[in-house]
Amino acid sequence: MVVSAEVIRKDAVFHVAWILGTGDSKKLSRREILDQNLPELCHSIIEMVPERHRGSATKTGLYLLSLLTYGTVLIHQVQVDFLKRDVEKLKELMKKKSFILLMAERFDRNQELQRKEDKFARLRSKPIMCVEELDRVDLAHLQAIGDELGINGNPGDFIMMDALPNMNQWIDNNSELNAIYGCVEPYLREKEITMHSTFVEGNGSNEHNKERRNDAVIADFSQLLFPEIPEITLGEKFPIDVDSRKRSAILQEEQEEALQLPKEASEIVQEEPTKFVSIALLPSETVEQPAPQEPIQEPIQPIIEEPAPQLELPQPELPPQLDAIDLVTIPASQQDMVVEYLQLINDLPDDENSRLPPLPKDLELFEDVILPPPAKKSKVEEEEDALERARRRPSSRPVTPINQTDLTDLHSTVRPEDPSFAIDSQIHDVLPQRKKSKRNLPIIHSDDLEIDEAVQKVLQADYSSLVRKKEDVIAKIPPKTDAVAVLMNLPEPVFSIGYRLPPEVRDMFKACYNQAVGSPVSDDEEDEDEEEEEEYKYAKVCLLSPNRIVEDTLLLEEQPRQPEEFPSTDNINPPRQLQENPVFENLEYEAPPHPIRTARTPTPIKDLKYSVISLFPTPEKRRETSIIAELNLDPIPVEEIDPLLTMRTEEELENVRRRQKSSLGVQFMRTDDLEEDTRRNRLFEDEERTRDAREDELFFYSSGSLLPNNRLNIHKELLNEAEARYPEWVNFNEFTADHDRKKAATAFEGLLLSLKNMKVEAKQEDPYFPILVRHISHEEM
């Protein structure tokens, strides 16, 4: 037998799981999903799994089982989402409660706890016999007494009341035992009895059987126990102290107010015990004609409610709808029987041992006395009946709602029929098709995927030597609160630490600005007017040394100085700015060895030397001074310094065309007419100084990228150099020392490509250290 998809879809257990698993467009309500029993659903799916080597068993396809399993997972997910949403709403609702409501709830909770504490303080275990008559008990009958009362009958169970703890002490001292075995069960007998039952439920006896225990308590043990002694005799023969009287008064109050335990007697017919709350006797003259007049003010309630000695437990209360019953509401056919029964009760003697007469068998007092249900309840029942009739109708078409309100009805569709596992005459092979997921899932390769050896080597290569941490690469600049002397020792330019220097030092190193050192470069072939060209200014940054500005003066060597004309260098004080600043107190000021003067004379003087001033005696400055002294440079006369001579001379047109295709060079607009370009350059020679590409240290403009052939040639140069010097390492920094910036960047790009293609290997010891490159020989590999 084969289970088809149609049978599973109509099954009441798999209906919701099938809809969710197949992605059906039918909408399910919240109640339908929450009503699903997941353990039962999983058990049903397991039962449908076919077993091995059993051809006659019910066969269910793996595809159907997988859909049901997937639907079960979706049901669990939706149920968890509903629970999470409800908890969040409840949490928000609790947050919105006002402070007054919270205080009111806390006050009510404290009142309830106080009431329970007062009740436990008054609660004591209930006695079962009098302590004064304990010696008269026949120990031979003790086992029978224990069996009837529901205790083990051990003599240790009869203990004096003063040796027993109260309820609070019992809970505090035996909390663990209470959690395992239960609490003490009270058994009520007489008023002045002071013996207690101290056994615990679950100790091997049959105390947990409430019906048997109630029958035993209600039964009469006069044959086994001693005869009861009146209170007067007890008082004369065995005086009772004041505390026992107080406890007996408390027990009497609890009997009248708190205790409401069920009571069933073995002699009474197995019917619900009756209790008349407000019933009054009428004279015999008015019984035949009941009227709503005032009843006689002699109630029989005390006689009925006072229990007999054998029945110590109170009667259970009647339902609330029977509290207001009067004789007028009793049917006419039952009134005579009720009056006769009440007359029998009235004629009973005033004896505590007297019992109520049995109820007449034909008395049906409360069968027809049923109050009409509320209007709202009747309306709900009518709606449920209508929905049930619509659900059980033979038609399979769902209920068509009449208005918009019924559209949200949870029972607007037909309940699926019971599953029938009979073999279908026509099994439809058309299974529901799920839509393809729109998510871009990653491609899962097979296990036998072959990877090229070169790719494996690249993936396994260790480039950790080229990776540096950010902390190692970033320049570590001292904080702003460092001393100026520490800043002076740094080999960094002024512009990187100038903002941390005091104003007195910053005034000594001012940057100068050169005007119009370049103009924008465009690759457009169209000519632009000269008026549209904008001039750009660039900042010139100097190192930590005074600006060397050549003026129209000559350095004159002073004649042999006289002692009185020039003071000693030992008495020369540092500048006023350095004296006022306390930062420079510990700095050493070195005066110039040969004081010089400037004179505006065109007469050159031979044998002139540079004079060096060491402003701050730092190691870098001392090294710079020693280098300048070793060079022994001759000063250049001012008339020989011509800025126009430093400009670029005229070049051939072919060289200009080749240079314009390079990446670095501050050039003008590229045009086809090179003669016009040359003429335009001459116009700017008188107004501004055109800087060469190598002189521009900060900014450059590009006239276009390198041609592909030039780019590949630069890459090939590095490979050829590394292959020629194999197995030695090639210093990449020295290799690109003579290159311009863009050519060096292109060479570095070739280095990265060669590393990726495993043609070369590189290493670098520390940041800012030279990069060493070596050719990789694949023959050795």
Curated annotation (Swiss-Prot):
Biased composition (Basic and acidic residues): 408-418
Disruption phenotype: RNAi-mediated knock-down results high embryonic lethality. F1 worms have an extended lifespan, an increased incidence of males phenotype and improved survival to toxic oxidative stress. Worms have defective meiotic chromosome cohesion and chromatid segregation.
A GO MF term: chromatin binding
Segment forming the signal sequence: none
InterPro entries noted in UniProt: Rad21/Rec8-like, Rad21_Rec8_N
PTM statement from Swiss-Prot or TrEMBL: Phosphorylated by air-2 in vitro.
Domain of life: Eukaryota
Keyword field: Chromosome, Cytoplasm, Cytoskeleton, DNA damage, DNA repair, Meiosis, Nucleus, Phosphoprotein
Tissue expression pattern: Expressed in premeiotic and meiotic gonadal cells. Expressed in spermatocytes.
Localization of this protein: Chromosome; Nucleus; Cytoplasm, Cytoskeleton, Spindle pole
One example of a Gene Ontology biological process annotation: meiotic sister chromatid cohesion
Modified residues (Phosphothreonine): T625
Bias-annotated ranges (Polar residues): 397-407
Main localization category: nucleus
Gene Ontology cellular-component terms listed: chromatin; chromosome; condensed nuclear chromosome; cytoplasm; meiotic cohesin complex; meiotic spindle pole; nucleoplasm; nucleus
Listed result of changing T625A: Reduced overall phosphorylation
Transmembrane spans: none
Region of interest (Disordered), ranges: 374-418
Family: Belongs to the rad21 family. Highly divergent.
Biological role: Plays a role in meiotic chromosome cohesion and segregation. Necessary for sister chromatid co-orientation and sister chromatid cohension until meiosis II. May also be required for repair of programmed meiotic double stranded breaks. During spermatogenesis, likely involved in spermatocyte centriole cohesion, thus preventing their separation during the second meiotic division.
PANTHER family referenced in this protein's UniProt entry, alphabetically: MEIOTIC RECOMBINATION PROTEIN REC8 HOMOLOG, SCC1 / RAD21 FAMILY MEMBER
Protein name (Swiss-Prot/TrEMBL): Meiotic recombination protein rec-8
Source organism (scientific name): Caenorhabditis elegans
